[in-house]
């Protein structure tokens, strides 16, 4: 957790490697913004769904007919908001995996990597996993927050995408205090369950990443992430949080 006003940081194994799961879509989005800054891609460019880029798992685009065209802007929203795997494949195919890999050091990523095998949605182990760390994910969010990811207009666009409300608030977003706002991305794959977020609060903003792995129960992992979020809610909201928090019934 990093306080974005004071820079004060609380860490627990921040450099441990975890399968990135769908958190990898955040640096993919940043790479796409670099491609646009370099004049090689546009938010208005339209890409077509085909059998080659249709991917199962998360997202609704897999149900769209072949030939359906969507703007890059919309694909990025689907990729983050629905964690849509088809949108992700379409964006990756347009940029090229090699280009995206080259941007990771440019973004400031030393341990986070992306590989073709790592993009697989299968549940078992893969030859080359996409790994990340809590420190690097939090660093990316801080750069976006401060307008330092690619450039200020790109950071503002990405922040708005991350702020879009998900269908059902969960993990770090569950039980968000009134008047707060969250920009976040979740991940869930190969026994990994994550959430990485920026919280906007009346008492100061902060970034927080929780990575969990080797989970036997995704439900328990999600509950743990939510409990950790609530500890920070109490810290930043103080007595106000306890006053509005739902009380448990006594038995």
Label for each model-derived stretch:
Residues 1-14, 200:
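A short, well-structured edge-of-sheet supersecondary motif
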Residues 54-91, 97, 130:
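Conserved catalytic neighborhood of penicillin-recognizing serine enzymes
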């Amino acid at each position: 957790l990093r306080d974005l006003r004071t820079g004060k940081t609380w860490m627990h194994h921040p450099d441990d490697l975890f399968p990135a799961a769908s958190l990898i879509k955040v640096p993919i989005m940043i790479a796409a913004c670099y491609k646009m800054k370099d004049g090689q891609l546009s938010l208005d460019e339209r890409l077509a769904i085909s059998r080659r880029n249709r991917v199962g798992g998360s997202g609704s685009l897999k149900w769209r007919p072949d030939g359906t065209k969507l703007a890059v802007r919309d694909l990025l929203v689907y990729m983050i908001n629905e964690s849509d795997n088809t949108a992700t494949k379409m964006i990756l195919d347009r940029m090229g995996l090699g280009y995206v890999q080259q941007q990771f050091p440019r973004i400031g990523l030393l341990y986070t990597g992306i590989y073709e095998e790592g993009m697989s949605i299968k549940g078992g182990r893969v030859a080359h996993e996409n790994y990340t760390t809590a420190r690097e994910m939090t660093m990316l969010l801080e750069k976006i927050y401060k307008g330092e990811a690619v450039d200020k207009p790109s950071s503002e666009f990405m922040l708005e995408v991350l702020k879009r409300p998900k269908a059902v608030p969960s993990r770090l977003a569950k039980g968000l205090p009134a008047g707060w706002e969250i920009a976040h991305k979740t991940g869930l794959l190969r026994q990994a369950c994550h959430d990485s977020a920026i919280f906007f609060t009346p008492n100061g903003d902060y970034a927080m990443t929780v990575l969990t792995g080797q989970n036997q129960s995704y439900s328990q992992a999600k509950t743990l992430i939510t409990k950790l979020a609530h500890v920070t809610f109490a810290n930043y909201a103080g007595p106000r949080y306890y006053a509005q928090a739902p009380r448990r019934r006594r038995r």
